[in-house]
Design a protein with these regions (language model features):
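His/Asp/Glu-enriched short active-site or ligand-binding loop at hydrolase and phosphoryl-transfer sites
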Residues: 50, 176-198, 245
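A short, structured surface patch at a secondary-structure boundary
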Residues: 24-89
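Basic- and aromatic-lined ligand-binding clefts that recognize polyanionic substrates
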Residues: 24-37, 131-187
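Proline-aspartate-enriched helix->loop->beta-strand connector
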Residues: 70-88, 102, 201-215
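Positively charged n-region of N-terminal signal peptides that target proteins for export
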Residues: 1-4
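Boundary at the C-terminal end of the N-terminal hydrophobic targeting segment
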Residues: 18-21
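Structured C-terminal subdomain patch of bacterial secreted/periplasmic proteins
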Residues: 24-25, 115-125, 134, 138, ...
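Bacterial N-terminal signal peptides
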Residues: 6-16
Length: 274
């Protein structure tokens, strides 16, 4: 387990000798895809990104979009040879770019680790990093499976969980999503698994009385959510001090690496021992 995690870290920080790839001018229209380019040692090829991407502010990188709204004119001016986006990006803008002869690749939001890995490898293939992408994807799957097996072996399955994404309105992770898969992969029961939508009432959570609550947010934004739950001392997760935090910039930007690392943190918070 530690060897696999070390491999992931080494790959991310460049301890592997990565194969050279043809230089490209890439525009990324999704934070998760930008993060993937960093993991594939292709950050230097990014010429444009969204204001929410980790490359925003980097020298030589132009911010040409928000989370969903893009500026086709600004993108064209960058003369990219590859534009990568998700289905969250306004499709009419992407069609405009395609009609101008630009290469645009759209990825839908992955709902499982396998889908996330497949997209990661596809991206790697497009930028000449298929071998590196495959290695990272396979290592992430090994980590995830190892955590699953050890959670079961240590008798840590069967607990109920709320994974909270927002507080106003209160929103929980449902089934059919990669975050929902993370919950069940660790052998836990998602109290929102069968809900048609993630918007919750506080009363629903109190009735469900989860053993654990994982709060996803950015930095200090998580503290008010934690304090609000602490105002319900009879709630099992509060009574047992089972309120845990997850960083939104990592969990909400799905890549094989962020999935595996977030899963490992959750497993340890759930009591997994090395």
């Amino acid at each position: 387990m530690r060897r696999i995690l070390s491999l992931l870290v080494c790959l991310v920080v460049g301890c592997f000798s990565l194969m050279a790839s043809t230089p490209r001018r890439i525009v990324s229209l999704a934070p998760s895809l930008t993060r993937s380019l960093y993991y594939l040692d292709a950050a230097d090829e990014i010429v444009g990104c969204t204001s929410y991407c980790m490359a925003a502010g980097r020298k030589g990188v132009t911010v040409i979009a928000s989370a969903v709204k893009t500026s086709p004119e600004a993108i064209v001016a960058l003369k990219p040879d590859l534009i990568i986006a998700t289905t969250l990006t306004r499709q009419s803008d992407l069609e405009t770019l395609r009609k101008l002869g630009l290469e645009v690749v759209t990825y839908r939001s992955g709902t499982t680790l396998d889908e996330i890995c497949d997209q990661f490898v596809d991206l790697g293939k497009r930028i000449g990093k298929e071998a590196e992408a495959t290695t990272l994807a396979e290592a992430s799957k090994v980590v995830a499976e190892d955590l699953k097996q050890r959670m079961s072996a240590q008798g840590l399955t069967g607990r109920t969980m709320l994974m909270q994404l927002g507080d106003d309105p209160l929103y929980g992770v449902t089934g059919g999503s990669y975050m929902g898969e993370m919950i069940t992969r660790l052998g836990c029961i998602n109290i929102c698994e069968d809900l048609g939508q993630g918007t919750l009432s506080r009363e629903y959570v109190l009735r469900s009385d989860p053993d654990y609550i994982f709060i996803i947010g950015m930095g200090e934004d998580r503290q008010p959510m934690i304090k609000r739950w602490q105002s319900f001392p009879d709630l099992k997760a509060v009574r047992l001090d089972h309120l845990y935090e997850l960083e939104a910039n990592e969990v909400s930007q799905p890549t094989p690496i962020t999935y595996a690392l977030a899963l490992r943190k959750m497993a340890h918070d759930l009591g997994l021992k090395e």
